[in-house]
Amino acid sequence: MRVVFMGTPEFSVPILTAIIGHGYEVVAAYTQPPRPAGRRGLELTRSPVHEKAEQFGIPVFTPKSLKGAEEQDVFASLKADVAIVVAYGLLLPKAILDAPRLGCYNGHASLLPRWRGAAPIQRAIMAGDAETGMMIMKMDEGLDTGPVAMAEKVAITPDMTAGELHDRLSMIGADLMIRALGALERESLALQPQAEEGVTYAAKIDKAEARIDWSKPAKDVHNSIRGLSPFPGAWCEMEINGAVERVKLQRSTLGEGSGAPGTVLDDRLTIACGEGAVRLATLQRSGGKPLPAQEFLRGQRVTKVL
């Protein structure tokens, strides 16, 4: 079976690796173009999928768009049986969707139709969802609207971070995709339309959302911290030894106590919220590495959180 793989971030890599490992012929990898990196943006960094594909000698294509006739002709010339799409980052026009003999299949990190869109992992945690999952669906022209082929649910534990859920769903996605490809080869892959009710959209995370608002209930603050960990990272300003610093908050738990929002309630970094309190568990100063709260506080005095 001739496969074109389309993906960009680290999340996609285990799925690409599994497809290669199970003997499928990956004839091309499509990924986002290299992006500027470094302090001055003078270096170009290739995506994780780009790096992995080159390790296996797979031709890599990095178009900025697939809307043009030339790019669509190149894609069609690959004569793929199927295209596998996992967090690629570009919308696929009808000409691309129709080119593979068996269609295009997407690995999506939510229980559709909940959390269609760009940031399903973060949004599920930030909303306080108790479960999510991984789904394989056949793509159509809508945004994550196609019929579902396979799904697996995953519980979201109370202190689970987006990073932990990301890794779990990526591995589940690899297993599901291999099962889906096998069923596709056997012509036994059943498709079920998505439910019409329960549709929500997982908008891309805005930088403004990363600043913690201590006037919100503790549950919401906690969900924001873990939903934005490790990237882009929730943050606040702290008065440390008399100077105000910006600090990233990577882990937290629900705490006990109450007070004016932002009040430091004890020497374990329990912070009062609009309702209840949150205990900060892992913090990161600018230019430093994430540290457990006890280590972060060594020799430091936090008097105020803004």
Swiss-Prot record:
GO MF terms here are: methionyl-tRNA formyltransferase activity
One cellular component term (GO) for this entry is:
cytosol
Give the record's keywords alphabetically: Protein biosynthesis, Transferase
Presence of the UniProt keyword Nucleotide-binding in the record: no
EC number(s): the record gives 2.1.2.9
| Source organism, top-level taxon | Bacteria
- Chemical reaction(s) catalysed: L-methionyl-tRNA(fMet) + (6R)-10-formyltetrahydrofolate = N-formyl-L-methionyl-tRNA(fMet) + (6S)-5,6,7,8-tetrahydrofolate + H(+)
**Does this entry carry the keyword 4Fe-4S?**
no
Write down the top EC class of this protein: transferase
Q: Which CDD domains match?
A: FMT_core_Met-tRNA-FMT_N, Met_tRNA_FMT_C
Q: Output the InterPro entries linked to this UniProt entry.
A: Fmt, Formyl_trans_C, Formyl_trans_C_sf, Formyl_transf_N, Formyl_transf_N_sf, Formyl_transferase-like_C_sf, GART_AS, Met-tRNA-FMT_C
Any Pfam family from its record, for instance, is Formyl_trans_C
Which purpose does this protein serve, as stated in its record?
Attaches a formyl group to the free amino group of methionyl-tRNA(fMet). The formyl group appears to play a dual role in the initiator identity of N-formylmethionyl-tRNA by promoting its recognition by IF2 and preventing the misappropriation of this tRNA by the elongation apparatus.
Recorded family membership: Belongs to the Fmt family.
Family annotation (HAMAP family): Formyl_trans
The protein here is known as Methionyl-tRNA formyltransferase
Please report the organism this UniProt entry assigns to the protein: Brucella melitensis biotype 2 (strain ATCC 23457)
- Gene symbol? fmt
